[in-house]
Amino acid sequence: MVDSLKAAGRPVVLSPILVHKEPDPATHKDRETFVPKVFADAGVPFVLQPAGFGFTADGQLWYQAARCVREGVSREAALAAITQNAANAIGMGEALGSLAVGKWGNLAVLSGDPLAQTTVVEKLYIEGKPAYDRATDRRVKELTTGQPQPVTEPKQDAAKPDAKADGK
């Protein structure tokens, strides 16, 4: 089956449950197979997806990618599974999944290693435009200082006039 998937040339979207368990017929003990490693070893690109229960680490993409590395998948393959392979799987590889001239320019600037639990998003750019800056996030300031922060209205984008100004 892995060979036919490889021949198809498309990434395989994996279940959030990354370990397949089945009883060994001889010992009746569970055998565990780390599914991403099977595909990585065969050269089949794969995509990781978060679990619907993202409150635990194993439901988070960074954790799934880090677990892949821990289980012997190359760091490059693990990162591709949450970036370029995902974009390719939905037919958007020409626009998303990596940074290159002509692509949309979606980028997360992180505080450290993307596979580390302590890493946070510092800045976020969508289509090359700033979309988030942790340094100006009122909620982060409240959490880190313990002091309430004033609520400020977001700046109106000059290219998008206010609906009230249009009389609507």
Protein language model features and the residues they cover:
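Extracellular/periplasmic ectodomains of large secreted or surface enzymes and adhesion receptors
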Residues: 123-168
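Short active-site-adjacent structural elements
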Residues: 117-118, 134
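Small/polar (Gly/Ser/Thr/Ala-rich) solvent-exposed segments
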Residues: 114
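Beta-propeller domains
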Residues: 1-4
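His/Asp/Glu-enriched, well-ordered alpha-helical/loop segment
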Residues: 6-11, 15-110, 119, 130
